[in-house]
């Protein structure tokens, strides 16, 4: 057996350079590059290997470990999980910063390879800088925190362990049904240890991402179920995008007269204008999709995890005889809601179902319900686009909460802009092939409902983990995946303050992104939640502490986000009117450097509920009668929800 003597880190880099994937006959390099923030736990091991011979791996310098890992996740998501970035950090806090990102990847079924440095395998210098000592177990380090949020986890305590660990790592990273975060912890001494690795370990490896063929019996059972149903609805999930099954979905809907709603992950798999596309469904769904869903007697979920936001906490589907049919590559997800399951690739399953349903001449029983629902939403959408603030008699979309202080906000911001009119204007004024990115706050709800995707794969929402701070890092990752497209991070002031450090990386790499920052003076989404369930506005607005009350109910805190970003070298704009917004968007298109548009919008002017309910915990006992009433409403709604 021929061998080559390398350090563990050098062998890892050499191995990663030889990984390829094949999908539908197309072969491409799997690991494009590696994000790094070097520290004592990785710079002299993996850092040395990357400096000496990175191969074709592109090395990027992150600014925050969570941020760079989120950029890697967004890159892989935009690449439909067929190309990834790796990420390496030092020990301790650097590694811990990536734990949140690992959870984001695993929750969304997005592959990311995390390579945190670790403490010494020999334990000679224990406790090393940034090590946590556990008296009961000296094998435990910060990196064990990744176990709960990784789809595969390993620690390389000896150089020869790298071989079996990386084979398993690639298995998970290239498996559509089980992919997510893969964490390979690298003790800093082992990174530099040499070993005679077999040359065969470094051979070119092609990992075939195979389309799982549906079983004939499963297709037969699904056809018999559909045959009995008059008003089915399809849920278009992220699996439709990753399977590239958009055309098959459109043809299926058209042939059998079946409408479909979109999840956050599935939105823009098909353009919004398709006649059977109802738009967003569920808690953050629109009027059309949710009206049809309530009366559906069959729900056909394609590539969806059926999260509470999609199912309205299992209360959205109210037909007394509603049943579920699920197409998913994951057996775990296919079993949810006690569904009839077709465990298969979305495209192949749709083709098989189409063939069999054509044989029996199936067509749904809808008459004009789809058109009526879509027209109702189009009228509502037009209204939202034209919501204008006025001091006298204005009714905000989320009414009854902060009505009395809207004038204060308008004067403080020197703005009368509403969030819905701004979103409508942006949707009209940016390029049709531009890509928007979002994750948290009130914007995901507004965007799932209101955004019209005119081109496929132009809507990129991280809503599996809804991680605040994903937006700007995610925009960088999307830009790296789609360098010829304009990319827009749709971010609230709360998320911006949480994490925006990869703006600097975008400047460094000359990867222009556009940040559209909606400043409404607080955590508006959660303010809606607390006030909608009987609480007052408590620690969710950005206000000074009031010396008289001792609470955070003083005057509003002025924050100049444009000035903040300008310090990094970002081209910035301040927007208080629609005219200024249009000018800023047009000028931003001409820039070669990253931009930020600071948009002052009024609170409570985001969209609100449309025929949906969300199950959240409410205090069963309280001196506040409004909270007691909220608990009563929750219990009443829960009676209408499925139990499992």
UniProtKB/Swiss-Prot annotation:
Cofactor, how bound (note): Binds 1 Mg(2+) ion per subunit.
Which leading EC class covers this enzyme?
hydrolase
Q: What cofactor does its activity depend on?
A: Mg(2+); thiamine diphosphate
Q: Which UniProt keywords apply?
A: Hydrolase, Magnesium, Metal-binding, NAD, Thiamine pyrophosphate
Mention one GO molecular function: magnesium ion binding
Q: What is its EC number?
A: 3.7.1.22
Q: What is its pathway?
A: Polyol metabolism; myo-inositol degradation into acetyl-CoA; acetyl-CoA from myo-inositol: step 3/7
The entry marks the following residues as binding thiamine diphosphate, namely: 65
**Listed PROSITE patterns:** TPP_ENZYMES
Gene field: iolD
What InterPro entries does the record point to? DHS-like_NAD/FAD-binding_dom, Myo_inos_IolD, THcHDO_hydrolase_firmi, THDP-binding, Thiamin_PyroP_enz_cen_dom, Thiamin_PyroP_enz_TPP-bd_dom, TPP-bd_CS, TPP_enz
The record describes the protein's role as: Involved in the cleavage of the C1-C2 bond of 3D-(3,5/4)-trihydroxycyclohexane-1,2-dione (THcHDO) to yield 5-deoxy-glucuronate (5DG).
Q: Which reaction does it catalyse?
A: 3D-3,5/4-trihydroxycyclohexane-1,2-dione + H2O = 5-deoxy-D-glucuronate + H(+)
The identity of this protein, by name, is 3D-(3,5/4)-trihydroxycyclohexane-1,2-dione hydrolase
Q: Which organism is it from?
A: Geobacillus kaustophilus (strain HTA426)
* Record-level GO cellular component terms: acetolactate synthase complex
Return the annotated region ranges for Thiamine pyrophosphate binding.
Answer: 442-522
Q: Does the keyword S-adenosyl-L-methionine apply?
A: no
Q: Which residues bind Mg(2+)?
A: 493, 520
Similarity field: Belongs to the TPP enzyme family.
What is one Gene Ontology biological process annotated in the Swiss-Prot or TrEMBL record? isoleucine biosynthetic process
Keyword set includes Cell inner membrane: no
Q: Tell me which SUPFAM superfamilies the record gives.
A: DHS-like NAD/FAD-binding domain, Thiamin diphosphate-binding fold (THDP-binding)
């Amino acid at each position: 057996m021929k061998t080559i003597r390398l350090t563990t880190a050098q062998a890892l880099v050499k191995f990663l350079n030889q990984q390829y994937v094949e999908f539908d006959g197309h072969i491409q390099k799997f690991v494009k590059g590696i994000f790094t923030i070097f520290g004592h736990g990785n710079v002299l091991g993996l850092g040395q290997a990357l400096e000496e011979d990175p191969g074709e791996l592109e090395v990027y310098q992150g600014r925050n470990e969570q941020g760079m890992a989120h950029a890697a996740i967004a890159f892989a998501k935009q690449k439909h999980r067929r190309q990834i970035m790796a990420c390496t950090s030092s020990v301790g806090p650097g590694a811990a910063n990536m734990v949140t990102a690992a959870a984001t990847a695993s929750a969304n079924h997005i592959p990311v390879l995390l390579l945190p440095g670790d403490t010494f395998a020999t334990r000679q210098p224990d406790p090393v800088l940034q090590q946590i000592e556990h008296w009961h177990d000296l094998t435990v380090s910060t990196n064990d925190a990744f176990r709960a949020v990784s789809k595969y986890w390993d620690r390389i305590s000896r150089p020869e362990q790298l071989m079996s660990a990386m084979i398993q790592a690639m298995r998970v990273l290239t498996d559509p049904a089980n992919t997510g975060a893969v964490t390979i912890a690298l003790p800093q001494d082992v990174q530099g240890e040499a070993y005679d690795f077999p040359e065969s370990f470094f051979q070119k490896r092609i990992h075939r991402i195979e389309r799982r063929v549906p079983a004939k019996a499963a297709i037969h059972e699904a056809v018999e179920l559909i045959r009995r149903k008059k008003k089915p609805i399809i849920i278009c999930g992220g699996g439709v995008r990753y399977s590239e099954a958009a055309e098959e979905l459109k043809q299926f809907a058209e042939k059998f007269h079946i409408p479909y709603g979109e999840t956050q992950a599935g939105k823009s798999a098909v353009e919004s204008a398709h006649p059977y596309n109802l738009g967003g469904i569920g808690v953050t769904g629109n009027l059309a999709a949710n009206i049809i869903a309530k009366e559906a007697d069959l729900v056909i979920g394609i590539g969806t995890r059926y999260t509470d936001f999609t199912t309205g906490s299992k209360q959205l589907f109210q037909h007394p005889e509603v049943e579920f049919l699920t197409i998913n590559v994951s057996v775990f997800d296919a079993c949810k809601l006690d569904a009839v399951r077709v465990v298969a690739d979305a495209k192949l399953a749709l083709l098989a179902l189409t063939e069999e349903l054509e044989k029996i001449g199936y067509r749904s029983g809808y008459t004009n319900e789809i058109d009526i629902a879509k027209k109702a939403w189009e009228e509502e959408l037009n209204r939202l686009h034209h919501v204008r603030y006025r001091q006298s008699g204005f009714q905000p979309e989320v009414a009854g909460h902060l009505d009395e202080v809207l004038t204060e906000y308008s004067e403080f911001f020197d703005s009368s802009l509403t969030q819905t009119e701004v979103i409508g204007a942006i949707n009209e004024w940016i390029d049709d092939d531009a890509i928007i990115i979002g994750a948290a706050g009130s914007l995901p709800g507004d965007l799932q409902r209101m955004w019209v995707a005119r081109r496929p794969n132009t809507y990129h929402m991280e809503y599996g983990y809804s991680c605040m701070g994903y937006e700007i890092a995610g925009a960088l990752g999307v830009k790296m995946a789609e360098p010829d497209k304009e990319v827009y991070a749709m971010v609230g002031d709360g998320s911006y303050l949480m994490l925006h450090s990869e703006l600097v990386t975008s400047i460094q790499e000359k990867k222009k992104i556009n940040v559209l920052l909606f400043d409404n003076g607080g955590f508006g989404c959660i303010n809606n939640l607390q006030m909608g369930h009987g609480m007052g506005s408590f620690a969710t607005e950005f206000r000074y502490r009031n010396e008289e009350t001792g609470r955070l109910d003083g005057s509003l805190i002025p924050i100049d986000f444009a000035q903040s970003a300008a310090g990094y070298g970002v081209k910035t704009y301040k927007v208080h009117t629609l005219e200024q917004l249009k000018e800023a968007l047009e000028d931003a298109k001409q820039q070669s450097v990253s931009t930020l548009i600071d948009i002052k919008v009024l609170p409570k002017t985001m969209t609100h509920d449309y025929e949906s309910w969300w199950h959240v915990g409410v205090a069963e006992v309280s001196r506040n009668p409004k909270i007691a009433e909220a608990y009563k409403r929750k219990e009443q709604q829960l009676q209408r929800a499925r139990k499992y």
